[in-house]
Amino acid sequence: MIYEDELRQMHALVDRARAAGVDAVIASDLSAILYARRIGMEVHISTQCNLTNSEAVKFFSQWADVVVLARELSLDQIGRIARAIDEQQICGPSGDPVRIEMFAHGALCMAVSGKCYLSLHETGCSANRGACRQICRRKYTLTDVETGAQLAAEGQYLLSPKDLCTIDFLDRFIGAGVRVLKIEGRARGAEYVLSLI
């Protein structure tokens, strides 16, 4: 999400990325997508766009050769989208079929991709603007407000699913049509990412 008074800052940031030799930007805000394309930068459509079907992929294909599908999709759903890309010849600006990018490792959000407001509500930092404070990954207890009784729950990480780890079924990811693998890096140190490669 980029607000009106942030457009110049976004332009300057994308300009600096291009000048530094960055290959592509990952974006969800249409202003960033359009500006990056206007200055000749490749765009990858972010998971924040919550792409869950081939019509959404077709819409964004006018600006991007790579789309990051929503993390909530099953392998079957990813496969159906990949087949639709092939069957309908959904191509990006390069003229090649759009490539599907998926997270191969990292945190799973307890909310729908691009729709979490917990961090904003609790800390004033919006996950939808790349500033998630991962409030969901803290330990919590579940209490019945009417009786005060603590309810039984497995573990204390009630809002935090286990991290995504696809190493044991990368072949199924690739078989479903995933062409680009993504490792979560935001809010992680370089050592974390290095240990996974």
Regions inferred by a protein language model and the residue ranges of each:
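Anion-binding and metal-coordination hotspots
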Residues: 65
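Active-site pocket-lining/capping segments in soluble small-molecule metabolic enzymes
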Residues: 1-51, 55, 68, 76-78, ...
